[in-house]
């Protein structure tokens, strides 16, 4: 089965207090086990990952260095996204390669720095929803809004985070290179952090200050690759309605009519579960016999067998 995996933040940083490169590398080693399990089972796997915490951390480091010495330049947001794509891709490709070699599997694992075209008139630019960086208390968030002009929103009851524009992906610039590598048997890591958001200006591609949601980028890649399945891996075993309430209910399988109903009820948090569900819906509608599943990282293999996760069907 040809699968596109979308890896969430927990696949890169398990401990929110440990933001070090060493901590990320160790978490990637654990993530590589779940990825290698799928490859060992004979699945053709391509990988997309998020970058919310990392892009916020890199940006904060750059801003702090500039405050200490204004000779240290500030970098545009799209460039910061490119930094994160290389940083995370480097860790993922090496840990997946290492885990495969332990199992006697010799496959090339490669990261492609990916630009993703967005519409400059996308409404997402006027309504920031994508959380980045660390979690803050309400008081800390209010101070950041006042001092730095950030837009801060509560993130699924876990605290407050900065939110930035999150336009939808229109196309992938490097799609032909990705398709060629996948068809040649490479394990490709692409659209890292949703890809570097760019708009077309004649023959030129211009970066824009935004973070494309990795779930929508993964869906776009899955369509381009004509994948059989889109597997979005996150921190929870199943999608829930009435989340964090006494009557919380885990969903094993939902059809598109139910998806629309739950979205209308506001059951899924913007910037969190909502884009995952919407990306799955879009992929299921993209062709016949398309499989879309939201599951936990550790239960990825079980989710493909129907033993875990939430399956979205027509």
From Swiss-Prot:
Protein family membership: Belongs to the carbamate kinase family.
NCBIfam families, per database record: arcC, PRK12352.1
GO cellular component, one term: cytosol
Known catalytic reactions: hydrogencarbonate + NH4(+) + ATP = carbamoyl phosphate + ADP + H2O + H(+)
Source species taxonomy: Bacteria, Bacillati, Bacillota, Clostridia, Eubacteriales
Keyword rRNA-binding: no
GO biological process: arginine deiminase pathway
Name this polypeptide is given: Carbamate kinase
UniProt-listed SUPFAM superfamilies: Carbamate kinase-like (SSF53633)
Species name: Clostridium perfringens (strain 13 / Type A)
Compartmental location: Cytoplasm
Gene3D superfamilies noted in UniProt: Acetylglutamate kinase-like (3.40.1160.10)
Enzyme Commission number(s) from the entry: 2.7.2.2
Keywords noted in UniProt: Arginine metabolism, ATP-binding, Cytoplasm, Kinase, Nucleotide-binding, Transferase
Biochemical pathway: Metabolic intermediate metabolism; carbamoyl phosphate degradation; CO(2) and NH(3) from carbamoyl phosphate: step 1/1
Oligomeric and partner information: Homodimer.
Single GO MF descriptor: ATP binding
């Amino acid at each position: 089965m040809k699968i596109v995996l979308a890896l969430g933040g927990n696949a890169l940083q398990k401990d929110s207090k440990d933001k070090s490169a060493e901590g990320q590398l160790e978490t990637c080693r654990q993530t590589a086990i779940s990825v290698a399990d799928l490859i060992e089972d004979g699945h053709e796997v391509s990988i997309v990952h998020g970058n919310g915490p990392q892009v916020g951390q890199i940006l904060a480091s750059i801003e702090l260095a500039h405050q200490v010495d204004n000779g240290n330049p500030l970098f545009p947001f799209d460039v910061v996204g490119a930094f994160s794509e290389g940083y995370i891709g480097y860790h993922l490709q090496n840990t997946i390669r290492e885990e495969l070699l332990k199992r006697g599997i010799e496959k090339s694992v490669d990261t492609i720095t990916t630009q993703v075209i967005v519409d400059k008139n996308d409404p997402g630019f006027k309504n920031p929803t994508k959380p980045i960086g660390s979690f803050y208390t309400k008081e800390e968030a209010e101070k950041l809004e006042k001092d730095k002009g950030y837009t801060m929103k509560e993130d699924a009851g876990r605290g407050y985070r900065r939110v930035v524009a999150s336009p939808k992906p229109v196309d992938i610039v490097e799609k032909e290179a990705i398709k060629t590598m996948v068809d040649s048997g490479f394990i490709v890591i692409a659209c890292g952090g949703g890809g570097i958001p760019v708009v077309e200006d004649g023959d030129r591609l211009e970066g824009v200050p935004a973070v494309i949601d990795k779930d929508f980028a993964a869906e776009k890649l899955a369509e381009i690759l004509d994948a059989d399945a889109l597997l979005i891996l996150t921190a929870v075993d199943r999608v829930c309605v009435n989340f964090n309430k006494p009557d919380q209910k885990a969903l094993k399988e939902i059809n598109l009519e139910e998806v629309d109903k739950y979205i209308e009820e506001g059951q899924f948090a913007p910037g969190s579960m909502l884009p995952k569900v919407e990306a799955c819906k879009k992929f299921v509608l993209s062709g016949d016999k398309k499989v879309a599943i939201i599951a936990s990282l550790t239960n990825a293999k079980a989710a493909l067998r129907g033993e875990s996760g939430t399956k979205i069907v027509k």
